[in-house]
Design a protein with these regions (language model features):
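Active-site beta-to-alpha loop of glycosyltransferases that engages the nucleotide-sugar donor
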Residues: 11-22, 33
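Short, acidic, metal-binding catalytic loop of nucleotide-sugar glycosyltransferases
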Residues: 24-37, 44-47, 60-61
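Short loop->beta transition adjacent to catalytic acidic/histidine clusters or analogous donor-positioning motifs
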Residues: 5-8, 29-40, 67-69, 101
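Conserved catalytic core of nucleotide-sugar-dependent glycosyltransferases
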Residues: 86, 111-199
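Active-site-proximal specificity loops/subdomain of glycosyltransferases
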Residues: 43-100
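C-terminal catalytic/acceptor-binding lobe
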Residues: 2-7, 20-24, 190-283
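Short beta-strand/turn micro-motifs composed of small residues
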Residues: 11-13, 42-44, 133, 230
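Short beta-strand-to-loop acidic/aromatic patch adjacent to the donor-nucleotide binding site
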Residues: 95-111
Length: 283
């Protein structure tokens, strides 16, 4: 619990990463602020890999011991399943505003620093009605005649912020799911589960792979701010490269989403341009 709020940690994975996802789960279970529930949200069938899920022995053991909740989702929302699976369960529950839970999402290819949840919650920024993350970025759109415009970036520039390198809270446009992110259910409406149905121009296929950009743009439209919390580096983080907060697991080399985003950059660009009001800072 944190400020009398239940803390729900949640992540998703793909079938090819099931074998090693327990490493990430164990790092979540070993946080200095213990989550009240750790949820592995998975659909029956993976759209990305076109195959059904089969639980690993390690995940079965964690579930059988009551250490995690297996949440079987009706739909595959891609990487966003980590938030949308739990959100679908929580969004209609009768919470008062000061008692609704905190949902913290994690990626499936990191061994998270033990103070990750502390980094997100210790400043109580979550009580201000904002999304809190450890990493994020600001997006800048520039015209073709701008000196920073290139054919490669298509006029979309990004500045990354890591809470371990900042002395104060920073407002950002894009949350980085890799660093873990804290939300409250009231930040969302039901349209997040089928955004395309009410927004026919929404690039649904592209957004499936760039959940950070979709969720950030969606939240901006709802008037929800996103901030990067400031925190002290751990001794291990002090030895890491710039913007690196957590150690990769073996899953970082298994079907990495970053490869898809690098080889098909139009996925992110299409989604950014759809939410252009959220991503239109001036330089």
């Amino acid at each position: 619990m944190h400020n009398k709020r239940k803390v729900i940690a949640t992540l998703t994975t793909i079938p090819s990463r099931m074998e090693h996802v327990h490493v990430t789960i164990e790092s979540i279970l070993n946080q200095t602020i213990k989550p009240d529930e750790v949820v592995l949200s998975i659909p029956t069938h993976s759209i990305r890999e076109e195959k059904d899920y089969e639980l690993s022995d390690e995940v079965k053991k964690l579930s059988d011991e009551g250490k995690i909740t297996l949440l079987h989702c009706d739909e595959d929302y891609g990487p966003a399943t980590k938030i949308l699976g739990v959100l679908k369960r929580e969004i209609d529950l009768d919470y008062t505003e000061d008692r609704e839970p905190i949902i913290i999402t994690f990626d499936d290819d990191k061994r998270y620093n033990a103070d990750t949840i502390t980094n997100l919650l210790s400043s109580d920024l979550i009580e201000c009605g904002v999304v809190v993350c450890r990493k994020g970025s600001r997006i800048y759109m520039v015209d073709e005649d701008h000196p920073f415009h290139t054919d490669k970036n298509n006029g979309i520039l990004e500045r990354i912020y890591s809470g371990a390198d900042e002395s104060s809270v920073k407002r950002v446009d894009v949350l980085f799911g890799t660093g873990a992110v804290a939300y409250r259910p009231s930040y969302f409406d039901h349209d997040v589960f089928d955004y395309k149905s009410e927004n026919e121009d929404f690039p649904e296929v592209s957004a499936f792979f760039v959940d950070d950009i979709f969720l950030s743009g969606y939240l901006s439209e709802k008037g929800i701010g996103i901030v990067v919390a400031s925190f002290d580096k751990s001794p291990l983080q002090d030895k890491m490269a710039t913007h690196v907060l957590d150690v990769n697991t073996q899953n970082s080399n298994v079907q990495p989403l970053g490869t898809i985003n690098r080889t098909t950059p139009e996925l992110g660009k299409e989604t950014i341009k759809y939410f252009d009001k959220a991503y239109n800072n001036q330089m």
